[in-house]
Amino acid sequence: MPFAQIFMIEGRTEEQKRAVIEKVTQALIEATGTPIANVRVWIHDVPKENWGIAGTSAKDLGR
């Protein structure tokens, strides 16, 4: 059973998250031949202040 975890800085719309789930699911089906019912995708919305880029929070970088 393929299980994908996606970490993203918060702020994506529900529609964007749906698209990520659909496309990652399809990629796993194509790559592994797993039935769709067995694919899992978990999106982690990470607050900007909890995401570091080159030693600075994404919030401080204006991301």
Enumerate the language-model features and the residues they cover.
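A domain-level signal for the structural core that forms small-molecule/cofactor-binding pockets
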Residues: P2-R63
